[in-house]
Amino acid sequence: MRRMSHTKLHTRRLGLTVLLLILCSVLLVSCMAGPNAMWIRGIFGLDVNDYFAEAPLRQLQPDGTVAALLSNMVGIIVSDSIHLTPFSGTSEAVRIYRDAILNDMLRDDYSRYTGNRQAINSVSRVYPYLSTSTLIAKDDFENVVFRYFGGTSVSHKSGTAFSYLSRAGYYTSPLQARECVAEVEIRELYETEHTYRMQFVLTANGETSDIYTAVFVKRNDGSCYWKALR
């Protein structure tokens, strides 16, 4: 009887291991999409609340304090268009609205992010041929994302309007901050156990958007953050 060489035996074992990992991955994905999804996600420490399914506890006034807060949070993702792209969760929100968030930061605190000599000197040491006066530190961007969109980690990438200077840790743009041209018109606003759920439209230049539904998760300190837009 011929004996299998050590190399062939090792290759076969490696192949079986890879096959087993693939099967486990397929099984895990099917569980995440099936009836056991909530249980599986809970094991991994993911948010398992179905916020859209929460029953309304009370209706809030569209001209009240909460309404004003949420309208301002809508303004963070609005710049020069009344048409918004739906999202769910922090990562997707940042991927879609990175430029809009940075633009809102520049718009709200122009003097902080323009002409900051300390930031300019820091960047020029790493990018000596780059001439820019607009710089937003990645830490500032992360703080804004955590405050208004939740999450625990933020990716940093260049967008269309803002470029990420990875070696210096700053965002920069040659463009001026765009003003928010749209008005938020609230159609319905409800409070649930864990959220505020708001239906609204955007209006600008005589045009009105489709009706959007936004869900904001409440924090214990009275603040809230974006969860989803539909």
Which residues make up each language-model segment?
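Gram-positive cell-envelope targeting signals
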Residues: 1-52, 216
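Terminal low-complexity, poorly structured segments
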Residues: 5, 10-19, 23-24, 53-56, ...
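Intrinsic disorder/low-complexity segments
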Residues: 8, 34, 38, 54-56, ...
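Short beta-strand edge/turn micro-motifs at domain boundaries
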Residues: 42, 46-47, 58, 209-230
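Core segments of small alpha/beta cavity-forming domains
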Residues: 46-170
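Short, flexible beta-strand-to-coil junctions
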Residues: 106, 200-206, 218-220
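Generic structural signal for short, solvent-exposed loop/turn connectors between secondary structure elements
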Residues: 152-159, 204-211, 230
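Acidic, glycine-rich flexible loop segments
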Residues: 162-208
